[in-house]
Swiss-Prot record:
Keyword rRNA processing assigned: yes
Lineage, highest ranks first: Eukaryota, Fungi, Dikarya, Ascomycota, Pezizomycotina
One Gene Ontology CC term in the entry: nucleolus
Protein name listed in UniProt: rRNA biogenesis protein RRP36
Bias (Basic and acidic residues): 309-319, 327-342
Organism: Paracoccidioides brasiliensis (strain Pb18)
Highest taxon above the source species: Eukaryota
Composition bias, Acidic residues: 33-53, 60-71
Coiled-coil stretches noted in the UniProt entry, renumbered to this chain: 213-267
Sorted UniProt keywords: Coiled coil, Nucleus, Ribonucleoprotein, Ribosome biogenesis, rRNA processing
Family: Belongs to the RRP36 family.
Length: 342
């Protein structure tokens, strides 16, 4: 204790002023010895006092901690005893009064609704000068809002990748020509709104304008006669030679177009005949489900029909053309000879 340390402290008597000179003369010889003894005693007294003070403080802190721990343990024991006495019915009522747990999105929505509605700050609109300067400038990317829950549908951007081709000069929009023969709107109007005709516009257009094929055949025959006349004259004029080349190109293009029309018409006939057979088989009960032809099967059937309808000379020409085509393809696929090999 601090009081005991003060009582145990060694104190030296105060020297009077009148006896100071006498004391100084007597103690002149023993001054050094007394000084050393006083220093040692002072050091020992200081250490004992410090130790006594430290022990006193530690004792006070330990007593305070013991009191706090006792009070906390008493409070915890009271709380646990009160919780043990609560019934399950009271706990259920308390939970029902609190309500179900809400999601964070509803809380944020409530907070946003409670906020004062002020004038929303919109981004500054670009000036007309900037629009004229950069007409093809892309808009800044917008951040996608997150889903409200994991069960909500995913949010995906409708933006597409920008093409690497740069448009230097924007061409004006040119109105495209519309052919009424192949227009579904015109065919639908002319057929009293029949949807099957509107969907198969090309088929019905070819049926409606089938008389044009006769005009094409007549025009093709006239071009061939004109070409024969120019070739008979055998003039060395450059103008006639150019005309002959032009007529040849026109005849080949028209003949190829006629062949494509015939081939498509034959494909339609093959498909129509196959569908007719399948319907009859289903009606008779021979089949439960129809069988649909593939594109390769249709092409094979068309080739066989065309080959059977050809005459002897036409068959030979077709076979020779086919042989040359296969030979050229095989020649391209053959490896080239090495340089060092003879």
């Amino acid at each position: 204790m601090p009081i005991l340390s003060k009582l145990n402290k060694r104190v030296r008597a105060r020297v009077e002023e009148d006896d100071f000179e006498h004391f100084s003369q007597e103690s002149a010889s023993d001054g050094s010895e007394l000084g050393e003894e006083d220093e040692e005693t002072d050091d020992s007294d200081g250490s004992t006092s410090e130790s006594d003070d430290g022990s006193g403080r530690d004792g006070d802190e330990s007593e305070n901690e013991d009191l706090e721990s006792d009070s906390a343990s008493d409070a915890n024991s009271d709380i646990t005893s009160s919780l043990n006495n609560i019934s399950f019915g009271a706990l259920a009522k308390a939970q029902a009064s609190l309500g179900k747990r809400k999601r964070s999105t509803t809380l944020t929505a409530d907070i946003a609704s409670k906020r004062p509605k002020g004038p929303s700050r919109s981004p500054p609109a670009p000036s007309s000068k900037e629009d004229q300067k950069y007409p093809n400038a892309t808009k800044p990317p917008q951040k996608l809002s997150h889903r409200t829950s994991k069960h909500a549908p995913t949010i995906q951007s409708s933006r597409h990748a920008v093409t690497r081709k740069r448009t230097v000069i924007e061409t004006p929009a040119i109105p495209q020509a519309r052919d009424p023969r192949f227009d579904s709107v015109v065919l639908n109007h002319s057929t009293n709104g029949n949807p099957s005709i509107a969907t198969n516009a090309t088929i019905h257009a070819s049926k409606n304008y089938a008389f044009l094929n006769s005009y094409r055949t007549e025009e093709l025959s006239q071009l061939r006669k004109r070409l024969q006349n120019l070739q008979r004259e055998k003039s060395k004029d450059t103008h006639d030679e150019r005309e002959i080349e032009r007529l040849k190109r026109q005849i080949t293009s028209m003949s190829d177009r006629m062949q494509t029309f015939e081939r498509k018409e034959m494909e339609r006939e093959v498909l129509a005949g196959h569908r007719r057979k399948e319907r009859e088989a289903i009606r008779e009960g021979k089949k439960s489900q129809p069988w649909f032809l593939k594109k390769g099967d249709v092409k094979r059937e068309v080739v066989t029909r065309r080959f059977t309808e050809m005459s002897g000379k036409e068959k030979q020409r077709a076979l020779e053309r086919r042989r040359k085509k296969i030979a050229s393809k095989e020649k391209k696929e053959m490896p080239w000879a090495r340089r060092g090999v003879e």
